Amino acid sequence: MEYKDTLLMMKTEFLMRGNLPKREPDMQARWNEMNLYEAVQEKNAGKPTFILHDGPPYANGDIHMGHGLNKVLKDIVVRYKSMNGFRSPYVPGWDTHGLPIETALQKAGVDRKSMSVAEFRELCAKYALEQVDHQREQFKRLGVLGDYDNPYITLQPEFEAAQIRLFGDMANKGYIYKGKKPVYWSPSSESALAEAEIEYQDKRSAAIYVAFQVMDGKNILEPTDHFVIWTTTPWTIPANLGISVSGELTYARIEHEGKGYIVAETLVPEVIEALGWEGATIGRVFDGADFEYIKAKHPLYDRESLVMLGDHVTAEATGVVHTAPGHGEDDFRIGQAYGLDVLCPVDDKGVMTAEAPGFEGLFYEDANKEIGVALEEAGALLKLSFIKHSYPHDWRTKKPVIFRATPQWFASIKDFRAEILDEIKEVQWVPEWGETRLHNMFKDRGDWVISRQRAWGVPLPIFYAEDGTEIVTPETIDHIANLFAAHGSNVWYEREAVDLLPEGFTHPASPNGIFKKETDIMDVWFDSGSSHAGVLATRPELERPADLYLEGSDQYRGWFNSSLSTSVATTGKAPYKAVVSHGFVLDGQGRKMSKSIGNTIAPIQIMQQFGAEILRLWVASVDYQSDVRASMDNFKQVSESYRKIRNTVRFLLGNLDQFDHTTHRVAFKDLPESDRFMRTKLDQLVGKVKAAYDAYDFMAVYQLLHNFCVLDLSSFYLDYTKDILYIEKEDAPARRAVQTVMYDTVVTLLQLMAPVLPHTADEAWEFVPGVETASIFLTDLPEAPEMTEEGLALIAKWNSFLVFRDDVLKALEEARAEKLVGKTLEAKLLLAPNDETKALLATIDHLEQLLQVSQIEFVASAEKSYGTTGITVLKADGEKCERCWTYSTELGQDPAHPTLCPRCTEVVNSL
């Protein structure tokens, strides 16, 4: 007889190798065929809702690792909620307006000037929808489940109509106005930018000290005195109309070569050193407030510069600030208070205009040099140097931006700022610092410039009467919203103003019935920031406010910000109950991923080489709330973790062959204690994993599941129970007990890991015996039982045993290293435990089996101490059983089986 044929070895068709790049698309096709998303919604109909609202990615190009991180995090949340008692629909969205699409078309050779705006916009829309289709397939390949047949897209007519109504509501409440103010202006994009569209990069700039000679000193200063300013924007000197000082600072006159130079008193030594004025002396000291309304002479032009008090002035540089109301927010504010004009001698392209005599036609950066020369010739340039500093850049073109006063449309938040700050307190922020970050942004935030001088976007629904009066009324807004809903926003460019107005519309400022329409479009952040109105409030399966917004940390100044502004403005409430933010994905060395450096990794690469499951498991394994590093080495390490999890699942499934959980199950009370321990540990795991999911702590989910597979199962339970599973009779009570625990474990383990590893969980689900549900995602997670005192005591007892077992394993490892034994079954242990450990071991059955040795004897003392126990490892007595490999002195008691131990003899004879 071949005794190996009598062993009940593991048997399953669940493959050891995942072959994920090939097998995942098959699973996704299966989900598609069975309409899994719809089936999940039907399963959860009538349950409480949990709405995660998708922040729309920009529809341009392949998805990058930031998208991968973001979408997987969202999918984990939605899949978990859908398996844990909630109806959690997921409607993916796309942001489709804005400059990058215009630029992409122009790069593709589209000649904008050869067509109408409406025709160009049609091409933009076509391109955007192609990008949506492209990205949709990549998101689906990640395993992200959602309503892809009915996404929300910001160019959809119904979305644009809702956006117009939201704008109209804000206008009706007086929050929208037109004004000429300095805004971030991108010469490279030829458009205004919002703060959310700015990123800071290092830039080398000219830094100059300039002297402004006093014209009218008000009997305080002399005509030989000069105010000394320092600036890194020489090109703004032609726009100078004033000088700001602080009423809180004292100023001193530096006397040098017969002239006086006014700077903040505390900065005198610094300025003297910077200018190299050896021998300069310090004269009279003044209060800054005394300088108000003194007049200085502009260093280049025949006009005055008014000295003003500014609360923005600090004891830095010289303590005297060059003020150009057309080129700075504080400059504008102070200038308005003192009645100064708003001079802005720079055009849309960043070129100096005729209002800057001597520099007309120069690009502003090129003008820096010429202005420096002119100042030197005028005797006003005290020093020129160059500095490297952090400077605002256009986030799309990566080119520097300027502050430039232009007529723009603004959304004012001052009337509801307090409500916003109150609402921020009501939201759950993960991480908690998000609350402080957004609070500080709104506390100090100025008005939001919402107009853009571009073609591809939602037009501002504003008309102008014959005398220039702005027309925004509930009637016109309602009519435009209806037109957009029916025809899309391109109708604005296809029809004349009069044809866009309600029939028979009149206005006293247009006696001849002539109207013009606004040519600016809305900031794209107004588009996505309207999604709570255009999606949450309009789609029947969704609700406002959403339970969760989950995006990258850059969205504190982006989508979290614009959504909160528009929602509080129109509803008085935040659009979200909770906000979770994640960091950026960096390369393996902690550098920003950049095509120019060549250090980018695309999700599609990871999926082709390793599979989406590996990318998803990586997402769960990192501290996503901070910046995370991604390299091929990271993914190789995660692949190894995945292999261990998969092998654990395979072992569990492989030992359930012929097990019927309805008839073979052993009741909990009848399980041997070691099996009760593992079953109780499983219950404890359910509680811990669900708590981690609820706290959005996916790294803890990963660690709990991985450690349970590797430490609790593979290294302990699955290791010692092989002796039961393979050796005992098929229906032996001990074997059925282990199978009962294994069945519950594999079902629970697959359910707990399903939100993170959906392909693997659903693949394995098909091989769980007796399962009738078509997909694991149509099941619900088990409830986490409350841990009883008895259960906790059981876990504590067996945890103590596992500490003892670790000590035994150390002793066995040393014996193996000394060639005393090979496999542990070749060993006999002499144990000399202390009283506490002795008492513990006295209550534990089948100690040899648990420790996987052939014999154990308790002795008074042993060779070496390990923890609480003296342990001697000897060669086992007797001979090796051919079937179970245990050493026994009782081999061959049955002459028919001379090489078998009594246990194996009994099993074989029963077959």
Curated annotation (Swiss-Prot):
A motif ('KMSKS' region) lies at residues 592-596. Keywords: Aminoacyl-tRNA synthetase, ATP-binding, Cytoplasm, Ligase, Metal-binding, Nucleotide-binding, Protein biosynthesis, Zinc. ATP binds at residue 595. One of its GO terms (cellular component) is cytosol. It catalyses: tRNA(Ile) + L-isoleucine + ATP = L-isoleucyl-tRNA(Ile) + AMP + diphosphate. The keyword NADP does not apply. Zn(2+) binds at residues 881, 884, 901, 904. Its main location: cytoplasm. Binds 1 zinc ion per subunit. A motif ('HIGH' region) lies at residues 57-67. L-isoleucyl-5'-AMP binds at residue 551. Its EC number is 6.1.1.5. IleRS has two distinct active sites: one for aminoacylation and one for editing. The misactivated valine is translocated from the active site to the editing site, which sterically excludes the correctly activated isoleucine. The single editing site contains two valyl binding pockets, one specific for each substrate (Val-AMP or Val-tRNA(Ile)). This is Isoleucine--tRNA ligase.
